[in-house]
């Protein structure tokens, strides 16, 4: 893997062929997730659910459409990976969100290497977080809140090198 090559090609993919992710691809994605750092090494504070059942994906999509008034917020991807964490309720503690984000980015980069499309998902996750029946269907443990997700799947949308503007993020260098 060439990390910079993957970083400069990674993008949000929103079109999918519907071809399922293979068992080998899933295993490699999960290995990338397991390699992610988690605050203070507290891996028991985060859980991951891999959703491939079409009926569950449809239910999540429907919940998101109902809440946000937009159809197909999962873009027809055959896989949704949901990250849920124990939130402490303290606004100053964002480690749960940060942990999910690091896992999602590892998954994103692995998807690039595997030639799979991927897109970081928030709207459907927000809808899922408010639907106790769906959380139960996804076997999200009591006390955990869905905080991030990634759709993954085969796509005809190829990864090509992007020109990333310098200073895209306002930056101050204090030396």
Regions found by a protein language model. Give the residues of each.
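Solvent-exposed alpha-helices and their adjacent loops that cap or buttress functional pockets
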Residues: 40-43, 72-75, 138-144, 163-166
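Proline- and acidic/polar-enriched loop/turn elements at helix boundaries
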Residues: 45, 123, 146-147
């Amino acid at each position: 893997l060439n990390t910079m090559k993957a970083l400069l090609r990674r993008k949000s993919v929103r079109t999918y062929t519907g071809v399922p992710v293979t068992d080998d691809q899933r295993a490699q994605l999960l290995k990338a997730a397991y390699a992610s750092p988690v605050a203070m090494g507290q891996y028991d504070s985060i859980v991951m659910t891999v959703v491939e059942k079409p009926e569950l994906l449809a239910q999540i999509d429907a919940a998101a459409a109902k809440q946000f008034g937009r159809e197909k917020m999962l873009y027809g991807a055959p896989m949704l990976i949901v990250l849920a964490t124990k939130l402490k309720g303290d606004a100053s503690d964002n480690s749960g969100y940060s942990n999910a984000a690091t896992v999602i980015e590892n998954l994103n980069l692995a998807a690039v290497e595997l030639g799979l499309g991927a897109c970081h998902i928030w709207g459907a996750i927000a809808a899922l977080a408010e639907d106790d029946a769906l959380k139960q269907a996804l076997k999200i443990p009591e006390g955990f809140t869905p905080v991030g997700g990634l759709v993954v799947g085969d796509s005809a949308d190829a990864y090509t090198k992007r020109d990333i503007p310098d200073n895209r993020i306002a930056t101050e260098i204090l030396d």
